[in-house]
Amino acid sequence: MSDSSHNLLYNKFELPESVKMSPVEGAVGGIDKVARFVADPLEKGMGHTLGSALRRALLIGLEAPAIVSFSMTGVLHEYMAVEGIIEDVTNIVLNLKGSLLKKYPLQDCEGGRCSQKLRATISIDASDLAAAGGQKEVTLGDLLQEGTFEAVNPEHVIFTVTRPMQLEVMLRVAFGRGYSPSERIVLEERGMNEIVLDAAFSPVVLVNYFVEDTRVGQDTDFDRLVLQVETDGRVAPKEAVAFATQILSKHFSVFEKMDEKRIVFEEAISVEKENKDDILHKLVLGINEIELSVRSTNCLSNANIETIGELVIMPEPRLLQFRNFGKKSLCEIKNKLKEMKLELGMDLSQFGVGLDNVKEKMKWYAEKIRLSKNTKG
């Protein structure tokens, strides 16, 4: 446990209160497969920092189940055909690769994650063939007769039968990340005629992001991160982003342990948390009513800033543009405002105050406060 003496005070970072999720117009599959996420405001540069990290974690870090091998009655190897089935084994393998499975909740085997065998008996008689027009399609949903896996695409055709038959089919399902060619997949107790497949574990199909400018109060020097995520349905986009964030946090925690010093961030001042009347009484104060140096007072006077309200609504970069206004004066003003629990660049919109009307509004509020005091007196 680190001692409080090791803490370092950092200025506040602008952070989003929440991440907004919305569907993408015209996207196939709806919000369960494609979604857009917007996070703002962020400090300048953090949009690309977070966007790039999230994109990489989404593409390489997420796990999902996939079929890694199968066996079937009469199938000895993948370079053969089966009598009564239209597709040869090579095409059956390709169709199995297109199968999408998900499993909730995830369950672990003793000693770690392991593969599971799902067995199905496919019985097709003459009446089934007649009802199907002579060719009976066997789908992924038909093969999931046991276990806790759910097919994302249950109507996906695996093979087509043209004569009455009974088949025993075994699918082996495992969890993994990314893409694994068949030669890298190691199976425990592999059956004699068990055919191993290439496995695409990653449920994320596409990730794009871009960064826009956004504002905090009157200051436009902030980022808005827009992240668009498309999955294959094994994991929803919302879950994918949450999982990727946890993966990044897990990795960053290793670097965080390098030093005991802790950063304590100043909290952004929210006028919603303060009593509005108290804030208004501070905002209508004249610049000459607070203890500033003659130099700072003259700088503000030359900039035609007469009240605290006119001062706090100004973004920091704009103040530095005024003539003879330097960093020394800026530091003094920021410290004084901090004592008053105020800051530069405040959003006063809930008071109906903006840069275009701040002077008039401060006069109006000052008169309102004066009349209120006289009435109470």
UniProtKB/Swiss-Prot annotation:
Recorded GO CC terms: cytoplasm; DNA-directed RNA polymerase complex
Domain of life: Bacteria
GO molecular function terms listed in the Swiss-Prot or TrEMBL record: DNA binding; DNA-directed RNA polymerase activity; protein dimerization activity
UniProt keyword annotations, A-Z: DNA-directed RNA polymerase, Nucleotidyltransferase, Transcription, Transferase
Pfam hit, one: RNA_pol_A_bac
Region spans: Alpha N-terminal domain (alpha-NTD): 1-259
Catalysed transformations (reactions): RNA(n) + a ribonucleoside 5'-triphosphate = RNA(n+1) + diphosphate
Domain notes: The N-terminal domain is essential for RNAP assembly and basal transcription, whereas the C-terminal domain is involved in interaction with transcriptional regulators and with upstream promoter elements.
Similarity annotation: Belongs to the RNA polymerase alpha chain family.
Name of the featured protein: DNA-directed RNA polymerase subunit alpha
Organism: Chlamydia trachomatis serovar A (strain ATCC VR-571B / DSM 19440 / HAR-13)
Gene name tied to this protein: rpoA
